[in-house]
């Protein structure tokens, strides 16, 4: 990957705005929409809907409304048959979460064919996806989709489609960073992330928010 893409993700994460977090309510959990995700089997819609609710519930009940990431294998039926785990849960702090900090999630992302990573972000004033999120999606080939849920119950997602092109995606990522002062300041980080989201369709990544 090029130099911009190879920046340590923790550096990007540290530049995120330190807003006061929003405490999760039952109302936010109940308003999570059921989405017909592009390029994802219809049989998975309800599973992902349940997990999007779960990421809020876990954060509310077990992590003081801080960030949480759930990694879910789309090979779940096969893994269940084999008696293996198919969901990994990582608990983060107020500002970020590393999905790979959970050993099951790490194993799933390392070994299964396709995964979905569902992340709770609790700073609604930020872009729904951060550059760190985008970088994570591009870095791991078998992360098929990344879903961001906010503490207020809204959902956004990026999914790799049939025309997904990694080289073009990395070039777009670097272009987004270069066009925004190397993404050194908060506003630049947000603008770079927005630039990528706006143009993601050109590299075979579908973006939507609800």
What function would you assign to each model-found segment?
Residues 2-115, 127-210:
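Conserved beta-strand-loop surface patch within small alpha/beta domains used
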Residues 116-123:
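Acidic beta-strand-to-loop metal/phosphate-binding motif
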């Amino acid at each position: 990957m090029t130099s911009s893409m190879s920046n340590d993700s923790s550096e990007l994460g540290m530049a995120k705005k330190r807003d006061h977090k929003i405490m999760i309510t039952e109302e936010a959990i109940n308003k999570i929409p059921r989405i017909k995700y592009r390029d994802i089997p219809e049989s998975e819609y309800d599973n992902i809907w349940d997990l999007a609710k779960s990421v809020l519930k876990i954060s509310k009940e077990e992590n003081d409304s801080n960030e949480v990431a759930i990694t879910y294998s789309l090979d779940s039926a096969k893994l269940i048959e084999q008696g293996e785990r198919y969901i990994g849960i990582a608990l983060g702090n107020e500002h970020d979460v590393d999905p790979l900090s959970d050993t099951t999630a790490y194993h799933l992302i390392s070994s299964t064919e396709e995964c979905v990573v569902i992340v709770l972000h609790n700073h609604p004033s930020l872009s729904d996806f951060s550059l760190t999120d985008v970088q994570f999606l591009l870095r791991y080939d078998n992360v098929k989709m990344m879903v961001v849920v906010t503490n207020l119950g809204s959902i956004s997602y990026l999914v790799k489609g049939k025309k997904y092109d990694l080289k073009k995606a990395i070039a777009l990522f670097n272009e987004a960073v270069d066009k925004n002062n190397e993404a050194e300041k908060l506003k630049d980080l947000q603008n770079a992330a927005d630039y990528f989201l706006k143009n993601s369709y050109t590299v075979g990544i579908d973006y939507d928010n609800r």
